[in-house]
Amino acid sequence: MIAMVSKQPRKQRKARYAAPLHIRQKFMGARLSEALTKEYGTRSAAVITGDTVKVMRGDFKGTEGKVQSVSLMDGTITVDGVISTKVDGTEVPRPLNPSNVMITKLEMKDGRRASSIKK
């Protein structure tokens, strides 16, 4: 994919919607907590399943939980404890944008992720 040059919002949106998955992964970043920032020397990281996050914006502000799933196609994540109740009473996970959460605990089982964050 060619680097974005246009300032037009419609072309910015189109580029995001048409982006391949390996580019969409870059849109899944979230801020690290102050403790993690000091420990790893970086301000943000990509959210993966198993990370513990705190919701910073929206109706569920202050809620903390583990990431259940990550959807690159939708650009959203689902978190334990962030649920909406449908009219028929069933509970469904509420998708969140990763930019609205802060990572408080990293899942470090993946060796490649550990090495990329510890750079």
Swiss-Prot record:
Organism (species): Methanosarcina acetivorans (strain ATCC 35395 / DSM 2834 / JCM 12185 / C2A)
NCBIfam families attached to this UniProt entry: rplX_A_E
Subunit relationships: Part of the 50S ribosomal subunit.
InterPro entries assigned to the protein according to its UniProt record, in alphabetical order: KOW, Rib_uL2_dom2, Ribosomal_uL24_CS, Ribosomal_uL24_euk/arc, Ribosomal_uL24_KOW, Translation_prot_SH3-like_sf
Domain of life: Archaea
HAMAP family hit by this protein: Ribosomal_uL24_A
Keywords assigned: Ribonucleoprotein, Ribosomal protein, RNA-binding, rRNA-binding
GO (cellular component) term, any one: cytosolic large ribosomal subunit
Primary role: One of two assembly initiator proteins, it binds directly to the 5'-end of the 23S rRNA, where it nucleates assembly of the 50S subunit. Located at the polypeptide exit tunnel on the outside of the subunit.
GO annotation, biological process: cytoplasmic translation; ribosomal large subunit biogenesis
GO MF term (any one): structural constituent of ribosome
Identification of the protein by name: Large ribosomal subunit protein uL24
UniProt record similarity statement: Belongs to the universal ribosomal protein uL24 family.
One Pfam short name: KOW
